[in-house]
A protein has these predicted regions:
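C-terminal helix-rich "cap/oligomerization" subdomain common to oxidoreductases
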Residues: 105-106, 282-326
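Short helix/strand-capping hinge loops at secondary-structure junctions
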Residues: 126-128, 133-134
Length: 326
């Protein structure tokens, strides 16, 4: 039996595979103190991964880390070691050096406070940048980041993976005209951040995925284990987020429509988000607008202001005006 044709064919497939990998966009990760960097890298870099997303791969990392947040300080070294087991990944001492050696950037720091500083180093490059939640450690920082992106004509987007989960859950669901929605999810609080920025942002992003922009007022009820945040939209629709503490970390959604009320199953996972990220890197077209992301951040900031005022309604526009970059 002549094996030469088979051997040649296998060699060709191997060569094509190498060329395809060589054409992948080179991605740099900034801030290695979150489990997202491990999950994202496996999904992008490992063709054998269950939910592998092709088209980009992590080749550069910058450690970062925040000593005053235990979940950052206690994990950043271990996550860094795990990432450096990939032979294609190089650790850089500065963000500037990382940016020079990649095509696109993912700001991943679990701590939103350094995101503005990182953005100031990355966005002048013009390279497409995904910023993991939250965009910034405050509404003021978040507004400044998007202003910087506009100044340098650099495409930016931010999203929780729960956005894509909601989109998938509602793909073929009919409910007529949207009247409102309720979401729920975990809402652990980190003292260095506005209350909902840390974990409640997932359920808030779920709400905005359904409702879109246009929230006028926000009102919050707060107890030790629960936050209930209600937004009233300009057209009269009402959206509610319930953030749970000391309960099972589940996510849920109910959509109220003119013809139906639906509560679809929410299936979580990172692959749908990463498919959006890779497409964004390739096209430079953000799948989520700056307007929507900034209103989401303002919604959560308004919830904190409502808490400070004893649960009084707060106008989103007033919160935005009070948090313009200095």
């Amino acid at each position: 039996m002549n094996l030469r044709p088979l051997t040649s064919l296998l060699a060709l497939f191997s060569l094509l595979g190498l060329k395809a990998r060589a054409a992948d966009l080179r991605v740099g990760l900034i801030g290695l103190d979150t489990s997202h960097v491990i999950a994202f890298t496996k999904t992008l870099n490992d063709p054998k991964a269950k939910d592998h997303v092709p088209g980009a791969r992590v080749v550069a990392v910058f450690k970062g880390g925040s000593p005053d947040i235990p979940s950052s300080a206690n994990r950043v070294e271990g996550f860094t070691r795990d990432l450096l087991k990939y032979p294609e990944i190089k650790l850089y001492d500065t963000v500037a050096e990382l940016v020079k050696n990649v095509d696109a950037v993912m700001i991943e720091s679990v701590d939103g406070r350094p995101h503005l500083k990182y953005a100031q180093e990355v966005l002048p490059s013009g390279k497409p940048t995904f910023i993991d939640k939250p965009v910034g450690g405050s509404l003021r920082d978040s507004i400044a980041i998007y202003a910087l992106a506009k100044k340098h004509n650099t495409p930016v987007f931010s999203s929780s993976s729960l956005r894509q989960a909601v989109q998938a859950a509602l793909k073929d669901v009919k409910y007529g005209e949207l009247r409102g929605a309720t979401t729920f999810g975990p809402c652990d609080i980190e003292p260095t951040h506005p209350d909902l920025y840390w974990y409640g942002i997932h359920a808030c992003e779920m709400l905005y995925t359904v409702m879109g922009t246009g929230c006028v007022t926000v009102q919050r009820t707060h107890t030790k284990n629960v936050d209930v945040v209600t937004g009233v939209w300009a057209d009269g629709r009402v959206g509610t987020v319930r953030g749970n503490r000391a309960t099972k970390g589940a996510y849920g959604l109910t959509v109220f429509g003119s013809t139906n009320v639906v509560s679809p199953e929410i299936k979580t996972g990172y692959a749908p988000l990463l498919r959006d990220v890779v497409k964004f890197f390739q096209t430079r077209v953000p799948p989520v607008s700056a307007e929507e992301t900034l209103e989401l951040m303002a919604f959560m900031e308004a919830a904190d202001e409502s808490k400070r005022r004893g649960g009084a309604p707060v106008k989103v526009a007033d919160v935005v005006a009070a948090n313009q970059p200095r």
